[in-house]
Every structure is written in C-alpha cells, then in structure tokens.
C-alpha cells in the first residue's frame, strides 16, 4: 500500500512538471473575492526550473523549492484580511485578495504585476496605455510585497505608473526610502540603514575591528555592502574581505562561489566575525558546506535569516559557531496560531498552495518533523488538485504544530501590520464613499490616505514616517542550543531613535560581555599606556602598539593616540595610564639646606647682638670711639641684623608680601650698611691725605649724615619705583616635567639688576677709598678693603650661578651670597675690634693710643728722612736727608709739620691707630 502511494505521488509530480502555466488563473497561488482586492507577492518557491541556461521563449517556467516559511507568510496575509473582514473596521465591505508566487525571480514578479495593473473587470486582462491614469481602474487597489528588495524595486517602478500603494513587509533596502524614485512604496519594517548601523555598533561594542562580509549580487546586496562600509569606517571597523554570491539559486555558479567564499574565510584566520546579508537559501547552502569544512566563526545575521527555522534545524548547525542576529520587532500573533490549527477550514478550490502543501505532506508522511521542511523542499513541484479534502484534513491535523515551529514572529507581525495599515486607510477613505462599489476610489487616492494613516495591531499604534518607513526597531537574537535543539532567543532590543541596546536583565548583560571573548582583530590589542601606530597596511585596524611618551597617557585599550596631560598641573611617565598631579615645591622650612641656612642666619643675628652688647659695655673705650661712635656702629649692626633677617623671607611658601619684602629689605639695609662704611673709608682717606688741595676737597666732601641719607635714599627710590611699576609676585613655574615650582618672579630684571648694581657701585667706591687710605700699621682700611673684596667675589660668583640654577634652590643661592657678603663685612668690620676689646684690654686705653700715635709719628718721620722720595704734593721736588745731619732743610721740616698735623687730626677724630711698639704678629690682626 505504501509503495502504491509513493508511485502515485511520483506520477503526479512528473505530470505537474510537464504542465506549465496555461492560463493567467493558473498563475494565481491563492485568491478570494471581495469588494476591494488587495494583491500579494510572495516568493513561495526558491527558483525556477529551466532546462536551458538562458530562455529562448518568453514563457513563465515552472517553480521548484517549496518554502515553508514563505508559505506561512502567505497564510499570515490571508489571516489578517480575514481578521478585518470579521471585524467592524469595514462594515459592509469585504476585502479580497490575489496572491502570486514570484518564485524568487524578478521576471515572474513583473508578470504578476502586469496582471495587478490590468484593467478591472476586463475579460482581455490588458494594461492600457494612457497619458493620465487618474481615472484608470486596475484589477487591485494595493499590493503587499514582495519579500526581497531586488524584486520589490522592480515591481515598485511598475506600480509607480499608477501610484498604486505597495506595502513591503520584508524589503529593507535603504534606497526604497527615496520617495522620488519610489513614491508609492511604504513598508512596515525599518530601513536597512538602521540595521546596519546597529550591526556596526554591536561590532564596535564587542571589541571587533577585523571582519568579513558576505552579500548577494543584486541591488539589495550592493546597497547593504556600501552602507555597511560607511558605518564600519565610522566605528573604526575594518573589512578584511568582501564576498558576493549570485542572487538566485538558478545561477549555475552559486556552488563554486560558495566554495570560494569558504576558502577565503579559512585563509583569513584572524577574521572570526562575519556579517552575512544573504537570503535563507544562500545561508542554508553556505552553512552546510561550512559544517563539512569544519568552519567555526561568529556570524552576524541580517533580518532575512536570523530567525529562520530552516537554518536552525540544519543537522550539526552548532558546529558553525555562534550566531547573533537582528530580527523585526515581535508582536502579538497568538491569533495566527489559532488560524493554523484550523487551516483545513480554508476553501480548497481557491487556494492552490494548500493543495501543493498537502501533496508534499503526503510525500513526506513518514518523515520526522525535524526533517519535514527539507523533505518538502526536495519534493516540491507545482501542485495539482488531486487530493480529496478529507485526506488534506488528516494531514493537517497530523502536522499543524510543524507549521507553527517554522513561523517567524517578526515577519508574521510585519505582514499583519501591512494589511492593517491598508484596512485603516480604506476605512478613512470610505467614510464618505460607498466602497461596496469597486469604482469608489482610485489607488492613488488610497496612497494619499495611507501615508498619513494611524493604525493599530490591537496593542500599539503605528504610523509611517516621511520616508514611508515604520521604525519599530529590532530584536537582537542569539542562537542557543537548548535540549539538543538550536533555539533563537531574544537577547536585547535596539532603539533606533537613541542608537542604544536595551538589555533587560543581568543574564543578558553577561551574554553581551561573553561576546567580547571572541577575538576578531587584525592586530593585538594595545593595552592602556600604549597607542596605535598605523603600519603600511591600507587598513587602520592593522597597527603596532607604541608606548605613550612622557606627559602622555591612554586609559583605554586600542586608543588611536595618546592624550596629553595638562603640563601645568600634571605629569605622566612613559607608558602611563593616567596623569599624576605635580608636586608643588619650594624652599620649605623643613628642607635640610633651608635649616642649615637658617642656622647660619640665626648665628649671624646672635653674633650681631653679641657685638652690640660688647660695644655698648665698652662705649667710652678708644676702640669704640675710633669706630665712629656707638651710633654709627649701631646703624651698621642694625643693617647686618636686617640682612640676616631678610634671609627668612626667602624660605617657605612664596607669598606676594614676602616676594616684595625680601629684595627691598636686603637692598635698602645693605645699601645703608655700605653707606656707613663708605663714610668711614672717606674719613680714613681724609686723615692720611697730605696733599693740602686734596685734603681741602675731602673735607668739603666729608658730610657723613648727608652721604648716608643720599646714598640710601637713592636705593629707596629705586626700590619704590620697582614696587610700583613691576613689583615681584608669586609665579607658578610649570616648566619642570614632574614638579611645580612656587617662586618669586622679580617682576623686572632691570629693576633687580639696578638695585644690585647700585650696591656694587657704592661698594666699589668704598673699596677705592679704603684702598687709597690703606697705610702701614693702620688696619682699618685693610679690613674694609678685604670686606669689599669678599662682597665682590661673592656677588660676581652669584651672577652665573643664579642664572643657571633652576628649581626650588634658586632662593638658596641668593641666601648663601647674602650670608657670605654679610659675614665677610661683619667679620672685617667688628672682629678685630672685639679682639682688642676682649683680649687686649691693656692697649684699649687713651694713654696707650697716644703712645702709639707718637711712636708711629716718630717712625713715619724717620721713614721719610731715610727714604728718598718725591713729594708731588709739594710745590717742588725735595730730596730727603738724614735728620741727624747738621742742617735740616725747610722742606723736611714742612713735611714733619704736616705729619704731626695729620695725627693730631686723627686724635681729634678718634681715629684708630695701631702702635708700632706691639709685636708684628699682634699688629697684623688689628
């Protein structure tokens, strides 16, 4: 019996193969009468059966390769129309339909379109040529379909002639949003632009940048490829290879092209992520071959095949790797499930598809559900109505769950929305018309209403945008093996408006994170602290990793360039992942060098106080009086005290006050000190000047108080102008790489140099006067000269050191110079006198000083007599003779008188003198 059934089935198939399309009605897949007819285009069969490479006669060939999933789409349209007819949406108006099989061929779809455009209620079924189709009444009012963009474009160009509404449910090519080219086309799915943008976002988010892409050789595939290239570049993703497969299975080269594509995938070992824009039958063949070649990759699925049960049920499909895809947003299609349960109730005479399906079920009656789809595909031919209704019912009852398993929820919902959109538009159009009359309106009128209609699926409201698209978004799906079967699970949603993935729960987040474990990169990932250095390759994704230089950082992987730290406040070492705050530095109080300098300054202050006490207690002694008196000594000691104290303003955190105070305090006090010493040098020069004219001039010049006030006043003016016009301020020095130096900016180098230069001029004058007054056995001038030399040596050394020193120790250099010059002058001015006061009290008496003066006078006169000399200060040259000779010249006598006058002047002025009677070793220190 079973053998007989199989024999009869084979006979029917052979008979059907030999029966081409004889009449237009044979061409219709399903039909139902109504007041308003809606056309439908579905690729129910995968290809046309032709014995020739190219047709020789213009006839429609037989179609083979029955597709269960598209058969279900056809049923979804029928079900949606029946839902409207059974509702109150169009009271008294029945929607009918004519559904045609495109066989996945443009030519077949265009043939069906010609029948749609044929004149209504005309027996000849002709398409009339007119200059104006405004009043032309075609066979149908609108068309739903086709599924593939390539076919939809061709059909739409024909429908544009009459502006007949065409609502796509699966055609996603971006070009279809162009209302200039396709003014009558609308669709209930988003444009591919959004899908491709979401894919590029997913790839970038997962850390992949080296991928492959496979498309079809048609308008849809080429447009998708071009758009993806643009989005990939925007997301820094590189395409390692691009493979293009023939668009139709009838192409004899498809198997060769698939093999070449798989070999390319094997060669590109670093490419582990492949984007696939193919039709279901392409993917079916591709994956079967990939399983044979043991290829395991991550596949990014487009909405064409991401939820296709035909592919998920391929044996050992798990061996291909992981699949993440994008599917149309799901809706409530529970009523469609009930419709499938009662599929046998449809009238069989007008649904040839049901007869063909019944035939395939009979041929595959003993095949398991898992293999049933492939069995039907292999045995599919154009069906003849030879089965009884009772047999059909029995088969449907046996396999109704099988159909539901192959339903793609997103596509079913899109078809429902397409029918509902037309239904609501017809309702709005028929409110003032009698739509039971087929001539109530023209297709172009329906198009105008359809563009602005708001419709619902029972749960949500929808409307078309300005491009005729329905931006419902996408579901992101992941293929997972559950109980040994590959199952399509929803992983996330993609929000078109905000370009974000909406992840519902933590488990899904973990699945997203797991995608990052798959590596698909041309180059190894650059770690934080490194940047990408592009190689000679044409792809920016192929690069080398280079360490970030100093003061640069990267805190993420694969950054294209290193970020610059703020050089003013931060720094970074080589290969740094972050910037570090610069340490603020200045000559701090706890710095070892600062402590040492402070100790030296404090010792200097103590020494000044000790000297002041010694001089105060020995106020009336000749040594103190010969130093110019207590007032002059106190002024000099006060200046030294201020100089030592001024060093404290060079230490610690700089402030505007300390910056202004330290230089002016030192400059004025040191100038006052030098001015006082200058008057002493001038007095010594006056005391030992024997030229009457010079002596007279020096007497006129010698005005101690005026000299001190004038010299100091000039310095005060210099410092005042300095503070007014260019005062020293705190400066944040950021030129060092790792530290910030807080320092005092002198404001004006010219003013600073003028202040120091003026002190140097006074010191030089003082040095000249002291050097000129440096007489034998009179050590005051010698010590002043030595003190000035110390000052000059210290400050001459200071200039190059100060100019080349950088950092927080610049103030320390100036402190050291101040201490050296201050100690030098203080030592030379007061140490010899303190030595006499403390250690040689026997010569610190008036009688001892007078004795030394007379002794020096006698010695000086003897020296003049014994040593021939020319006295240029006299009116003529006089030769000195021995004073013991019997005759003393007048000239010699005159010199003696002048010498006596000089020492008398010294006594009157309380000038110091060192006795000749002291031993040489003692005198040298006084």
Swiss-Prot record:
Q: A GO molecular function for this record?
A: G protein-coupled peptide receptor activity
Compartments it resides in: Cell membrane
Which key words tag this protein in UniProt?
Answer: Cell membrane, Disulfide bond, G-protein coupled receptor, Glycoprotein, Membrane, Receptor, Signal, Transducer, Transmembrane, Transmembrane helix
User: According to the UniProt entry, where is the signal peptide?
Assistant: 1-18
* Glycosylation positions in this chain: 121, 259, 332, 378, 452, 555, 567, 590, 733
Similarity field:
Belongs to the G-protein coupled receptor 3 family.
- Can you supply one Gene Ontology CC term for this chain's record? plasma membrane
In which organism is this protein found? Homo sapiens
One GO-annotated biological process of the protein: adenylate cyclase-activating G protein-coupled receptor signaling pathway
Residue numbers on the Extracellular membrane side: 19-594, 653-669, 726-748, 804-810
Matches recorded under InterPro entries: ANF_lig-bd_rcpt, GPCR_3, GPCR_3_9-Cys_dom, GPCR_3_9-Cys_sf, GPCR_3_C, GPCR_3_Ca_sens_rcpt-rel, GPCR_3_CS, Peripla_BP_I
Q: Which protein is depicted?
A: G-protein coupled receptor family C group 6 member A
What does the record note on quaternary structure?
Answer: Homodimer; disulfide-linked.
Topology Cytoplasmic: residue spans: 616-631, 691-704, 770-782, 832-926
The regions listed as transmembrane in this protein's record are 595-615, 632-652, 670-690, 705-725, 749-769, 783-803, 811-831
Role noted for this protein: Receptor activated by multiple ligands, including osteocalcin (BGLAP), basic amino acids, and various cations. Activated by amino acids with a preference for basic amino acids such as L-Lys, L-Arg and L-ornithine but also by small and polar amino acids. The L-alpha amino acids respond is augmented by divalent cations Ca(2+) and Mg(2+). Seems to act through a G(q)/G(11) and G(i)-coupled pathway.
- Bilayer topology term: Multi-pass membrane protein
Report, as the record phrases it, the tissue specificity of this protein.
Isoform 1 is expressed at high level in brain, skeletal muscle, testis, bone, calvaria, osteoblasts and leukocytes. Expressed at intermediate level in liver, heart, kidney and spleen. Expressed at low level in lung, pancreas, placenta and ovary. Not detected in thymus, prostate, small intestine, tongue and colon. Isoform 1 and isoform 2 are expressed in kidney at the same level. Isoform 2 is expressed at lower level than isoform 1 in the other tissues.
Q: Which PROSITE patterns match?
A: G_PROTEIN_RECEP_F3_2, G_PROTEIN_RECEP_F3_4
């Amino acid at each position: 019996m079973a053998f007989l059934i199989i024999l009869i089935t084979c006979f029917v198939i052979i008979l059907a193969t030999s029966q081409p399309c004889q009449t237009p009605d044979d061409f219709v897949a399903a039909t139902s009468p109504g007041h308003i007819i809606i056309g439908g285009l579905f690729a129910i069969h995968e290809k046309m059966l032709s014995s020739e490479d190219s047709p020789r006669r213009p006839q429609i060939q037989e179609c083979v390769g029955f597709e269960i999933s598209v058969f279900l789409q056809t049923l979804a349209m029928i079900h949606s129309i029946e839902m409207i007819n059974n509702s109150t949406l169009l009271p008294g108006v029945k929607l009918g339909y004519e559904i045609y099989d495109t066989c996945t061929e443009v030519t077949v779809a265009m043939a069906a379109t010609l029948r749609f455009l044929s004149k209504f209620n005309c027996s000849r079924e002709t398409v009339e040529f007119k200059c104006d189709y405004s009043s032309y009444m075609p066979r149908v009012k609108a068309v739903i379909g086709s599924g593939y963009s390539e076919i939809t474009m061709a059909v739409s160009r024909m429908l544009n002639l009459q502006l007949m509404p065409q609502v796509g449910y699966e055609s996603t090519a971006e070009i279809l949003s162009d209302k200039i080219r396709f003014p009558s086309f609308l669709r209930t799915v988003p444009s591919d632009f959004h899908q491709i943008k979401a894919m590029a976002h997913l790839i970038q988010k997962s850390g992949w940048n080296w991928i492959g892409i496979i498309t079809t050789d048609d308008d849809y595939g080429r447009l998708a490829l071009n758009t993806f290239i643009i989005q990939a570049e925007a997301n820094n993703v590189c395409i390692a290879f691009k493979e293009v497969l023939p668009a139709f299975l009838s192409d004899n080269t498809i198997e060769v092209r698939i093999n070449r594509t798989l070999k390319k995938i094997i060669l590109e070992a670093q490419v582990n992520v492949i984007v696939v824009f193919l039709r279901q039958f392409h993917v079916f063949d591709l994956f079967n071959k990939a399983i044979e070649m043991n290829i395991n990759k991550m596949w990014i699925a487009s909405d064409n095949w991401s939820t296709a049960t035909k592919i998920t049920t391929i044996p050992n499909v798990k061996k291909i790797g992981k699949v993440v895809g994008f599917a149309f947003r799901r809706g409530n299609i529970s009523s469609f499930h009930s419709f499938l349960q009662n599929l046998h109730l449809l009238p069989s005479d007008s649904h040839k598809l049901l007869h063909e399906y019944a035939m395939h079920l009979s041929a595959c009656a003993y095949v398991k559900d898992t293999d049933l789809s492939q069995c039907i595909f292999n045995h599919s031919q154009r069906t003849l109505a030879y089965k009884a209704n009772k047999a059909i019912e029995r088969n449907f009852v046996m396999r109704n769950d099988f159909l539901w398993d192959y339903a793609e929820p997103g596509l079913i919902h899109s078809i429902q929305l397409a029918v509902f959109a037309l239904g609501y538009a017809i309702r709005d159009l028929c409110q003032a018309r009698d739509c039971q009359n087929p001539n109530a309106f023209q297709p172009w009128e329906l198009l105008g209403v359809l563009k602005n209609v708001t419709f619902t699926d029972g749960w949500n409201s929808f409307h078309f945008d300005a491009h005729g698209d329905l931006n419902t978004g996408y579901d992101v799906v992941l293929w997972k093996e559950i109980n040994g079967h590959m199952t399509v699970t929803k992983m996330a949603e993609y929000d078109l408006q905000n370009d974000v993935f909406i992840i519902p729960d933590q488990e899904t987040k973990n699945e997203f994170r797991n995608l990052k474990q798959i590596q698909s990169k041309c180059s190894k990932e650059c770690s934080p602290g490194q940047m990408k250095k592009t190689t000679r390759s044409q792809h920016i994704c192929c690069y080398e990793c280079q360490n970030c230089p100093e003061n640069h950082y990267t805190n993420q992987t694969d950054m294209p360039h290193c970020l610059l730290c703020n050089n003013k406040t931060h720094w970074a070492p080589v290969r740094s992942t972050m910037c570090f705050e610069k340490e603020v530095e200045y000559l701090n109080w706890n710095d070892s060098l600062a402590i040492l300098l402070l100790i030296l300054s404090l010792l200097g202050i103590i020494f000044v106080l000790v000297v002041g006490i010694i001089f105060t207690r020995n106020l009336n002694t000749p040594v103190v009086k010969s130093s110019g008196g207590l007032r002059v000594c106190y002024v000099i000691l006060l200046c030294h005290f201020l100089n030592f104290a001024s060093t404290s303003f060079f230490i610690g955190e700089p402030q505007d006050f300390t910056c202004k105070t330290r230089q002016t305090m030192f400059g004025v006090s040191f100038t006052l000190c030098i001015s006082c010493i200058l008057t002493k040098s001038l007095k010594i020069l006056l005391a030992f000047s024997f030229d009457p004219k010079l002596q007279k001039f020096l007497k006129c010049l010698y005005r101690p108080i005026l000299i001190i006030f004038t010299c100091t006043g000039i310095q005060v003016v210099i410092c005042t102008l300095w503070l007014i016009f260019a005062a020293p301020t705190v400066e944040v020095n950021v030129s060092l790489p790792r530290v910030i130096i807080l320092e005092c900016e002198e404001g004006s180098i010219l003013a600073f140099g003028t202040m120091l230069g003026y002190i140097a001029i006074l010191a030089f004058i003082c040095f000249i006067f002291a050097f000129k007054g440096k007489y034998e056995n009179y050590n005051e001038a010698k010590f002043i000269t030595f003190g000035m030399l110390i000052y000059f040596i210290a400050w001459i050394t200071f200039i190059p050191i100060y100019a080349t020193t950088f950092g927080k120790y610049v103030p320390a250099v100036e402190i050291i110079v101040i201490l050296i010059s201050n100690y030098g002058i203080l030592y030379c001015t007061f140490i010899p006198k303190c030595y006499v006061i403390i250690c040689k009290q026997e010569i610190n008496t008036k009688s001892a000083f007078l004795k030394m003066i007379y002794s020096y006078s006698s010695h000086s006169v003897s020296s003049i007599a014994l040593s021939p000399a020319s006295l240029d200060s006299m009116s003529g040259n006089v030769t000195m003779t021995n004073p013991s000779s019997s005759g003393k010249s007048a000239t010699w006598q005159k010199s003696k008188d002048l010498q006596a006058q000089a020492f008398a002047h010294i006594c009157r002025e309380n000038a110091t003198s060192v006795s000749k009677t002291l031993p040489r070793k003692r005198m040298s220190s006084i």
